Amino acid sequence: MSRPASSTPPGRPQPRRGALTPTLIVVALVVVGFIFFANVWTDVLWYQQLGFFEVFLTENLARIIIFLAGFALMFVAMFYAIRIAYHARPVYAPDSEIRDNLNRYQAQLEPVRRVVMIGLPVLFGLFAGSAAASQWQKVLLFLNQEPFGQNDPQFNLDISFYLMTLPFLGFVTGFLISVVVVAGIAGILTHYLYGSIRIMERGIFTSRAAQIHLAVTGAVFLLLLGVNFWLDRYSSVQNSNGRWAGALYTDVNAVIPTKSILAVAAALVAILFIVAAVIGKWRLPVIGTAMLVITSILAGGVYPWVIQQFQVRPSEQTLERQFIERNISMTRAAYGLDKIQEKRYNATTNATTGALAPDAQTTANIRLLDPNLISDAFSQLEQYRPYYQFPSALNVDRYEVDGKVQDTVIAVRELNPDGLSANQQSWLNRHVVYTHGYGVVAAKGNKFTADGKPEFLQAGIPSTGVLGNDSTYQPRIYFGENSPEYSIVGAPEGSPHREQDRPAGKEGDGETQYTFTGNGGPNVGSFFNKVLYAIKFQSSDLLLSDGVNAESQILYDRNPRDRVEKVAPYLTVDGNAYPAVVDGRVKWIVDGYTTSQYYPYSQQEQLSAATADSQTTAGRTVALPNSSVNYIRNSVKATVDAYDGSVTLYAWDDQDPVLKAWQNVFPTSLKPYSEMSGALMSHVRYPEDLFKVQRELLGRYHVTQPDNFYTNNDAWSVPNDPTVKEEVKQPPFYMSLQMPDQDKPAFQLTSSFIPQVVNGTARNVLYGFLAADSDAGNQKGVKAESYGQLRLLQIPPEAQVPGPGQAQNKFNSDPTVSQALNLLRQGASAVLNGNLLTLPVGGGLLYVQPVYLRSTGETSYPTLQRVLVAFGDKIGFAPTLDEALNQLFGGQSGAKAGDFANNGQTPPPAAGGSTPPATGGTDAKAELKAALDEANAAIRAGQEALAKGDFAAYGEQQKKLSAALQKAIDAEAKLGSEGASPTPGATTAPTATPSAAATPSPSPSN
């Protein structure tokens, strides 16, 4: 038969059909490799520019070395297991059927045998190396560990053994066991494939070489298993599976001795395997292995179960007492609760005249602005341009104003690229022109204007106020919580400005331009760097645009928390970074924690669950990761400059052994806190997430007597936030207050406790009040002695002090309050409950809640209209806090609130919350009708003004509305006096459940 004619012309070479696939593979590998290189090299540039290249180099060298060690161990063990088994193969298989089957398998494998013998160890080595490299922190902590100077109560070993040595030994042992198991399986399969192990009718045949190989492998495995059993003895004090953490009675008297026996038994059986390899008889190691398995089941499982069920359970409280004591003391030490100051607080519920006189300074500082509701007011009054924004939750800090410390609600005006109009949405605008925000905006926490707006301390464009101006501090915000992914800044000297800086003025249409002059990011002027960053951010514009010049810098990774996490990978970063004006710069202050889950006898806590509250649920604060810890320290205070992004880490808890170990690893990355300026010291706060973890633990661990702890009769819970619909915990609150044992007020972080919530129900009465001193002083490098001091007020149950839920219910169900709030709701306005603050003043507990009104419309914002207060069973309700307190405390509280200057802006209530006797029901009804008509007219006029954007007219109508409401309240009180209805001030609140219409609405964001 003739061969088909070729389609290729004579003389032309035949094409190589197989060349395309390898070429594509090579090209793909080159592309992937260059992308990987681009990401690595840009990281190098980022760390070098920031001054933390040591961190990048140390971490990645550690990862590489550990990866190579893990890869080498797995590769060598697996390769030689396969190689030894292959070279030990018999020349002929005695059984013809088996020989035929093996020949068939071997024939299929032979063409790729060398590839498989090397490829499989390489593949498993890559997996093993990657797994090992992820444990780099354990390795470095072990190599650089520092002693705690404290020993555990069971083995009397330094705590550092459990936090830094035992995790490393556990990792190494577990890794080696995995290597031996994988290598052993590979050896067995190879022996079987080449006939050294054969399954026959008479049993399993094993060649002499295979016996020796398997015996040695088994001996090594058993020796490692014995080491693992021995280490398990120490791990028992880290046990968190029981009712209490640590080694309990059964662990100490059954599990630990059993682990010792099993460790010795495993070593003996390993010796039997070696003997079997020498003499060729397997009876003893087989019997030994069987006995080891039986012993591990009986002694490791059955025996401890018998002890627990028949010895411990009948007398659990007695037998576990000393171990509960260990759990209590070690948990309190691990979480920094061992130095808490506890005080019995015999709180009164009687609101007597002048009761607040001893707490005059605290009363004057009570915060009325809710940082979670006032953001829209900041936006409407201070945003100026659509491309600016404020965060949904503002921050609470303090500044010295006129010689006095003033609680302040503060935020920075950040850039919002999404606010650009459609015709502005170009790459050049988003990354070269609009690059930064501008200015700090701050308002007094305890005051507001007569029409309910914030009273600003710092505001405007240009930025002016008590915190400084453009000439005294740098107002530009290049690094913030909502900054763009990246921006290109900088230009040669003398070049025209390209960056949009700020509006020329509030009313003017002009804009000013600016050129970044700091050192904020890697240089991106060279062609090579342009290519790298174009690949990193997948943008050809970055490579081709004329907006990138020889002096250009690229700013990225701009979130303060992200920057701290990158330069300090060993820290867990607090969910709330906050800005402060410090030494002429805007600094983001970030708290960092060193944590561990290996502290002996300490209770485990899930960070995400312990720190969850209404703030994290609503997304206002970043939630912490879902990781377990049983040791935590606020070891680092970090600052991130909002202008150039520079990061400074201060060793705040310089006595923390974990931090000391990391300082040994990264010796140049942290500065001592003695280098912190006085201005920075004055803005340091006690961190929220640490406080939330501590209060969660205190719910149980305020009890230190083991018998009471065992019964759990005095356990507490953090109350739910009564201002939101969801059943989530109330967040802690920053405020300036004076605790009963303090000489003067201090900036503190506070929370309260109610009886333990069981099956979703609890008595909502106060059992405890916790405050953490957040005042670090204002001296350079000197930490105030009182900073971080936890103070716990324990309230006796018989005091019957209402909890936050009860206080909110009293507000909602009071008929006078309901009437006024229903009037405020007319005209489609929403009534918003502000944060419900709890303060230990007047010999009892005072509740304060601002009430905001928000009308409909895109340009509306909340204005503070009323203040609710409660003390015991009485409540007050007035346009100002000062007036409400006077209502509550018999006409005169004894102290002035911060908003006392606003008194009289609306008709005040009668002294003591009472009204003169009505002269006639007809007159009172007429007054009430007239007041309601005035209120309705003011609401309608306000809505019309708001629709026109006339905020001045809207403010005037709000004043008229407030005055009309007060007239209505007075008129209703006159009518009520004739029918014995409650008066509007200082009334005993009914406990009836309010109607839906009479209940103040929670914040819409919740």
UniProtKB/Swiss-Prot annotation:
Signal peptide: none annotated. It is a multi-pass membrane protein. It comes from the Bacteria. Residues 490-519, 896-923, 975-1006 are annotated as: Disordered. Residues 495-509 have a biased composition (Basic and acidic residues). The chain crosses the membrane at residues 18-38, 64-84, 115-135, 168-188, 211-231, 260-280, 287-307. Residues 911-923, 979-1000 have a biased composition (Low complexity). The keyword Ribosomal protein does not apply. Pfam families: UPF0182. It is found in: Cell membrane. Keywords: Cell membrane, Membrane, Transmembrane, Transmembrane helix. One of its GO terms (cellular component) is plasma membrane. InterPro entries: UPF0182 (IPR005372). PANTHER family: UPF0182 PROTEIN SLL1060. Belongs to the UPF0182 family. This is UPF0182 protein Arth_2749.
